[in-house]
Swiss-Prot record:
Coiled coil: none annotated. It comes from the Eukaryota. Changing T24A: Small decrease in inhibition of rat muscle alpha-1-beta-1-delta-epsilon (CHRNA1-CHRNB1-CHRND-CHRNE) and small increase in inhibition of neuronal alpha-3-beta-2/CHRNA3-CHRNB2 nAChR. The record marks T24, F26 as: Important residue for inhibition of muscle alpha-1-beta-1-delta-epsilon (CHRNA1-CHRNB1-CHRND-CHRNE) nAChR. This is Neurotoxin Oh9-1. The record marks H7, K22, H30, K45 as: Important residue for inhibition of muscle alpha-1-beta-1-delta-epsilon (CHRNA1-CHRNB1-CHRND-CHRNE) and neuronal alpha-3-beta-2/CHRNA3-CHRNB2 nAChR. This toxin binds and inhibits rat muscle adult alpha-1-beta-1-delta-epsilon/CHRNA1-CHRNB1-CHRND-CHRNE (IC(50)=3.1 uM) and fetal alpha-1-beta-1-gamma-delta/CHRNA1-CHRNB1-CHRNG-CHRND (IC(50)=5.6 uM) nicotinic acetylcholine receptors (nAChR). Shows a very low inhibition on rat neuronal alpha-3-beta-2/CHRNA3-CHRNB2 nAChR (IC(50)=50.2 uM) nAChR. Binds to the acetylcholine-binding pocket and acts as a competitive antagonist. Does not inhibit human glycine receptor (homopentamer composed of alpha-1 subunits, GLRA1), but seems to potentiate it (about 2-fold increased activity). Belongs to the three-finger toxin family. Short-chain subfamily. The record marks T23 as: Key residue for inhibition of muscle alpha-1-beta-1-delta-epsilon (CHRNA1-CHRNB1-CHRND-CHRNE) nAChR. Changing Y46A: Small increase in inhibition of rat muscle alpha-1-beta-1-delta-epsilon (CHRNA1-CHRNB1-CHRND-CHRNE) and neuronal alpha-3-beta-2/CHRNA3-CHRNB2 nAChR. The record marks Y46 as: Important residue for interaction with muscle alpha-1-beta-1-delta-epsilon (CHRNA1-CHRNB1-CHRND-CHRNE) and neuronal alpha-3-beta-2/CHRNA3-CHRNB2 nAChR. It comes from Ophiophagus hannah (King cobra).
Length: 57
């Protein structure tokens, strides 16, 4: 599983998805992007799950 990310490519295990989420838990006016491979991607706001080379918003 290879997902396009902001800078380059991210490779995940076959049974995993690449997920990134915007959060502001550290700086209220400065969004932080959390990203990584996971087996289940949460469907909360600002989440994007990737499969193969396409992302579903």
């Amino acid at each position: 599983l290879i997902c396009h990310r902001v800078h380059g490519l991210q490779t995940c295990e076959p049974d995993q998805k690449f997920c990134f989420r915007k959060t502001t838990m550290f700086f209220p006016n400065h969004p932080v992007l959390l990203m990584g491979c996971t087996s289940s991607c949460p469907t909360e706001k600002y989440s994007v799950c990737c499969s193969t080379d396409k992302c579903n918003k």
